[in-house]
């Protein structure tokens, strides 16, 4: 071998140190369980998100709903063409009342988790203007597509009646 021994040792042992020599059995089992049920979970995510978007589009405190399944513009046409099994679990909307109404909405949620990540089986909500984008000026925030009252939801697989009830309560108290 013409490679320096230090490189060979590092290439072999750093990966083992950081990642382990193999996947633990419990982790392998959980990955298999997750893969076997991913289609069921994604269908539930998509179904719930479509119902939430429809609910939000009819609520008097909501000024705009951002969901591919509702869009009648060019993006909506592309979504209808390419997303045959559903439009995903993400749904955004804007409230009347500005930044304060967005924060009050989040504060009044009971079932939704207030976190910045997406893709969980649980329903998640975030108000970017007071969290992930709070360091930006109002102009910069708008330039990134985030209005002061914008709320982003990642809709989970809970029962749709529970999801809509929690959203309705939070909207009524925002």
Each language-model region and where it sits:
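PLP-dependent enzyme catalytic core of the Aspartate aminotransferase-like
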Residues: 41, 107, 123-174
